[in-house]
From Swiss-Prot:
Transmembrane regions: 12-34
Alphabetical UniProt keywords: ATP-binding, Cell inner membrane, Cell membrane, Ion transport, Membrane, Nucleotide-binding, Potassium, Potassium transport, Transmembrane, Transmembrane helix, Transport
Compartments in which it is found: Cell inner membrane
GO MF term set: ATP binding; P-type potassium transmembrane transporter activity
The name this protein goes by in its record: Potassium-transporting ATPase KdpC subunit
Pfam families, alphabetized: KdpC
Function: Part of the high-affinity ATP-driven potassium transport (or Kdp) system, which catalyzes the hydrolysis of ATP coupled with the electrogenic transport of potassium into the cytoplasm. This subunit acts as a catalytic chaperone that increases the ATP-binding affinity of the ATP-hydrolyzing subunit KdpB by the formation of a transient KdpB/KdpC/ATP ternary complex.
Family of the protein in this entry: Belongs to the KdpC family.
Membrane topology term: Single-pass membrane protein
GO cellular component labels: plasma membrane
Keyword Cell cycle: no
Length: 194
């Protein structure tokens, strides 16, 4: 019995440390140093949560920029079912999905003459990606401008404003947060696109 006492004491100490002290400390520090990020990077508009800056949304109307396809099961951009499709590059089903997406994108963007950007035709690994490259956003500018009856230059300027560039080029590539961009489009016109 004497040999069990140190083992039990150590187990109890580590249980309290890792199951209580550490989670409470990291939560408190997160709330103190990074409150916006620790609470999900939620985007509020008129005291209503409109989304998260970290999770994409399904935008299908012509007046909105469309994000990457979501591979989540049942509902697009479902954070509870995060994950990729797990289809291998050699899988004919993946090829068929990509061809169908490219055809749909071409039909929805008849003004676009260049090739469909890869990220608009392929789902991300998480299925929740909210960012596009500036090139993929620019590819959609003519459609969005026409649907909203805005000058192409004005929509292009908005894309440039919402392009986030890393501190140094080796730290990543420029990205456009589609959720924030679409909310800015709504704010610009004072309403939602149809």
């Amino acid at each position: 019995m004497i040999g069990l006492r140190p083992a039990f004491s150590t187990m109890l100490f580590l249980l309290l440390l890792t199951g209580g002290v550490y989670p409470l400390l990291t939560t408190a520090l997160g709330q103190w140093w990074f409150p916006w990020q620790a609470n999900g990077s939620l985007i509020h508009k008129d005291n209503v949560i409109r989304g998260s800056a970290l999770i994409g949304q399904s935008f299908t109307a012509a007046g909105y920029f469309h994000g990457r396809p979501s591979a989540t099961a049942d509902t697009p951009y479902n954070p509870l079912a995060s994950g990729g499709s797990n289809l291998a590059a050699s899988n004919p089903e993946l090829d068929a999905q990509i061809q169908a997406r490219v055809a749909a994108l071409r039909a929805a963007n008849p003004q676009a003459s260049s090739a469909v950007p890869v990220e608009l035709a392929t789902a991300s690994a998480s299925g929740l990606d909210n960012n596009l490259t500036p090139g993929a956003a620019a590819w959609q500018i003519p459609r969005v401008a026409a649907a909203r009856q805005l000058p192409v230059e004005q929509v292009a300027q908005l894309v440039a404003e919402y392009t986030h560039r890393p501190l140094a080029s080796f730290l990543g590539q420029p990205v456009v947060n589609i959720v924030k961009l679409n909310l800015a489009l709504d704010a610009l016109q004072g309403h939602r696109a149809k």
